[in-house]
Amino acid sequence: MEKKRSYYALLIPTLLTVWLACAGHSCARHAKAKPPMAGPPRCPNCGPMVVPYPLSTGPTCGDQAYRINCVGGKLYFGALHGSSYVITSINSVTQRIVLRPPGLASSVSCISADVSKQGLELDPHLPFSITSSNTILLLNCSQAMLQAPIDCSPTSLCYSYIKNNASPCSKAPLCCTFRTDGSQTAYTIRINGGGCLAYQSFVGLNPNKEVPPPGKKWPDTGLELQWALPKEPVCKTDVDCNLLLGKSKCLPDPTSLGLKRCSCKKGLEWDPVNAICGKCRHGKHCKKKKKTVVFAGAAVAVVGVTLAIAVAVIGTKHSHQKVKKDIHKNIVKEREEMLSANSTGKSSRIFTGREITKATNNFSKDNLIGTGGFGEVFKAVLEDGTITAIKRAKLNNTKGTDQILNEVRILCQVNHRSLVRLLGCCVDLELPLLIYEFIPNGTLFEHLHGSSDRTWKPLTWRRRLQIAYQTAEGLAYLHSAAQPPIYHRDVKSSNILLDEKLNAKVSDFGLSRLVDLTETANNESHIFTGAQGTLGYLDPEYYRNFQLTDKSDVYSFGVVLLEMVTSKKAIDFTREEEDVNLVMYINKMMDQERLTECIDPLLKKTANKIDMQTIQQLGNLASACLNERRQNRPSMKEVADEIEYIINILSQEVTET
């Protein structure tokens, strides 16, 4: 023993010396790091106007998602339906551009020049939106516009504008004012179909100041848009990234299948304003950017603590097994307390390991009915004849164990006809088990896409709508009625079970999260958490900023709606490379005005005119759910209400016939 002590006494200072030498060498190397390279090429000026990155006027500069046009020394912004507007100013710091509204079609009419295109409509899939700094004047309106938040009263600003600047509109029946300040960003200013035939817009009009008196000039008209900060440049190989950003790698973009982007090397991070790999200021890659003294001090502490732990482990090796058993007992006790504390007391109970082992025939593979990344599901028959489904974490999978325990916390607090019912829990085996009601008719995924072991009768359009409505109701209950609110976080067609009457039951709450409103900023319902879910269904905003909200579930449900309309999988590698992701595929078909080609042929074969109308309506609802900006997506309650409205259209048609 004395020899061992002498050995450690010599070993510790030797290791410290070697470690410090290596640390000093490493820090010296880091001190000689090259400065970051310039970013992607900025487009040349267009006449007198500077074109900042990421705006792009050509295929070799800027970011192609931010296309604008340079024609005759002027910049133009292209909207949908072939409309185009002059850009009067650009602010690269605030990422905003101001457009010139079209004005009236003639000097004697009160009709907008773009009335044939029904006003300004932006492509919601592009990174531009209308800001909240605009005051919109709606001219030549019908009585249908007399509702809040539109102001059509005699004191409305638009009447003052008509007197000064738009005399052709003085004989029009109504004019109204709409302030976008404080509202959500939008993509549309509608005229014609919305009850008005003309519009004008002003940026930053102060409502607390009087408008110009008669005879005085109003400020110039303008409509302000904002662009979202750009992602890293698109690439094909590392060579592209070296040319654009220096030492960066070309890696797959997790939010866009088939697309690759440059990823800055460690110690640097993407600066979307200056379009460079700049000095790292936050995030996990910044941890190496420490001063030499701090690094060396940390090294000393780490080595010392590590050696101390090593000596302690040698001395306590023989007591390890006893400690492990004690920990297991404590975990079992914690599970029991958690179940009894959260249970509604109606039907949830604790099952014994002996009961479950017998019911599953010792977890025979013959009873295995499902498996996933974290767990397995077995069919089981209890002693009273009740058929159940039993979920078990995989052996040595701590994430699976955590998810099953999380599922207990969630399901013990909810009760809804469209949510799978938890019968109880088993806590005295090595792995925790959940016992559910057995749902016999497979999953929505299997009914839409088929399964290897069973043939399913195709779902009718009316049945698909009922399943969509029931699922939306269940999710709306989690978001709104449950206290605290619950976000599912893994909504997909394979997690929607169908009973013997083809009614929907939402299942698999392993990734779900309870929302503690007391811990979220300003009492808003969002959670910061590592992105988890299923590829093809994952909300891109959640993936980018780790902010989980109820709208993350809405996005995932939008993908499910697309599956119902098309009978195509969310991710399918048998499709062309650019079409692997269903959302991207549908967006492409919409741009090409070929959306009807995507509808499930079995639906089209039997659909009448009303069916096709409601199929289109559900497709539009799916598109709203999939809006890239979460604030523009409907709530799950609104989704359920819209599906109910669509179902009522079909019901009225049946009644009339």
Swiss-Prot record:
rRNA-binding among keywords: no
UniProt topological domain (Cytoplasmic) ranges: 315-657
GO molecular-function term, one example from the UniProt record: ATP binding
Highest taxon above the source species: Eukaryota
Membrane topology, from the record: Single-pass type I membrane protein
Binding annotation for ATP: 369-377, 391
Signal peptide location: 1-23
Topological domains, Extracellular: 24-293
Alphabetized CDD domains for the sequence: STKc_IRAK
Keyword Chaperone: no
PROSITE patterns for the chain: PROTEIN_KINASE_ATP, PROTEIN_KINASE_DOM, PROTEIN_KINASE_ST
SUPFAM superfamilies linked to this entry: Protein kinase-like (PK-like)
Active site feature: 490 (proton acceptor)
E.C. number: 2.7.11.-
Family, per entry: Belongs to the protein kinase superfamily. Ser/Thr protein kinase family.
Protein function: Serine/threonine-protein kinase that may function as a signaling receptor of extracellular matrix component.
The protein's name: Wall-associated receptor kinase-like 20
